[in-house]
Amino acid sequence: MAAGKVWLVGAGPGDIGLFTLKGAAVLQQADVVVYDSLVGEGVLAKIPEHARLINVGKRANHHTMVQEDINKVLLEEAEKGNKVVRLKGGDPFLFGRGGEELELLSEKGIPYEIIPGVTSPISVPAYNGIPVTHRDFCSSLHIITGHKRAGQEYDIDFKALTQTKGTLVFLMGIAALEDICKGLLAGGMDPDMPAAVLQKGTTAGQKRVVATVGTLKEEVDRQGIETPAIIVVGKVCSLADKFAWYEKLPLAGWKVLVTRPRQHISKTADLLRKKGAEVLELPSICTVPVENNSRLYEAFEKLDTYQWIIFTSPAGVEIFFDEMDRKEMDVRSLGQAKIAVIGEGTKKKLKEHHLLADFVPSVYDGDTLGAELAKELQGNEKILIPRAEAGNRKLTELLEQTGAKVDDIATYTTCYEKSRLIDEKKELETGSVDCVVFTSASTVKGFVEDTKGLDYTKVKAACIGKQTKAAADAYGMQTRMAKKATIESLIELVEEMKQEN
């Protein structure tokens, strides 16, 4: 068997937007992903379903697997012929022990590549308004590990660091903050030198404490800081309040859980991130074509006899045209049929097939679609509705009441999924998540399936429309509904919820 290959991939500091394009591309090809606890949840959500996962932990004072065993795992998986991605928080070569992981691979002749990551000593200060270099304040940057091996003294030359007059960044040093400050002062540093501790940079948990070397430990104890955090020492720290930008974004500091179908890239998540939110994506449902689509195939044989075709979801559009392709049919087969869609998302999906919707309801839900379209009918039309197996029956009933003949055909089923990597229930129980966004009643049901036993009365739910809100209300959630059933209006709702919080 041919040997596989290993990629050491830097996942960046936490914000998925700082994960590199090359890293993301390699991740999609992985057979096996060996990942750290410091890899951001946004990056973890991008791991493909087909990849096998190996969690090696590596948080402060708690390692799921020791380094020597991690090295062996990489070797063994590559020797099986796998494409192995070693996903590491930050950059693999900056205190990431990437060099140690390559030693064994190199010795055994296993091919490998290094994909650098955006590193926290630069990105985390940047997200806090601190430029690590500035020609008016310093001309050098020094990155130091604040971690010391058990039973050993620091081998840091604090006097030499002080004499550089550059910016100092200490990683993994919060537990030793007092020793670091004392060492710098003993090395001759001015006690009034600006200094900062930056917590969970680039995420919703971002927090900073700016003080001086002489007062930093006391100030951190007073305000409270959680790990991971970095220590920055230098005159540039005085610029933090002046240059702070991230915290000014409307959703900065909020962590939002977005539920979505697995097959769909979430526009909602992208827009929330642009507003500053940390987004946790939960593929809570998936759509699967029904095993026997014979009823749809029968409808295909008489497509030109329908006056209306109604699509109630983007998935319905996608599967309908996939089945047409399978039967080697094209849009000419639709004849003179008009097309109605339930909302903007479905309208856009239809446009991908070079078709424009003839009818969109004023409110994007099945009841309004049925009521408003019924007013357009003469009473003898033939209507085709290819949609989910558990579709809204009221839509069909409203149309049939006009005398129309409706072929309501289930073309796909909705199944509920559980995340492999993220414990959504724990995230909500610990208060890490500020709001959950639902874009359909199905995503509500998928979320509930994934979080059984959760106290739903504590869940703040932002819902896109009436049916989605009703589904969330049924579980006692604290629901709010967007003014319009659009993604843009839903984002505005989340902003309002944060302002009211």
Task: Enumerate the predicted regions with their spans.
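Short, basic, glycine/proline-bearing loop/turn elements
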Residues: A2-A11, N55-A60, L141-G146, L280-C286, ...
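Structural motif
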Residues: K5-L8, D31-V33, A51-I54, N82-R86, ...
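Signature of uroporphyrinogen-III synthase
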Residues: P13-G14, A51, V66-I70, L74, ...
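Class I SAM-dependent methyltransferase SAM-binding "motif I" and its flanking Rossmann-like core
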Residues: D15, D91-T164, V209, F359-D365, ...
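Acidic, glycine-enriched active-site microenvironments
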Residues: Q29, E103-L104, T119, S123-A126, ...
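Short gly/pro/ser/thr-enriched loop/turn and capping motifs at secondary-structure boundaries
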Residues: E41-G42, A60-H62, T119-S123, S140-I143, ...
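Conserved anion/nucleotide-ligand pocket segment
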Residues: G151-A196
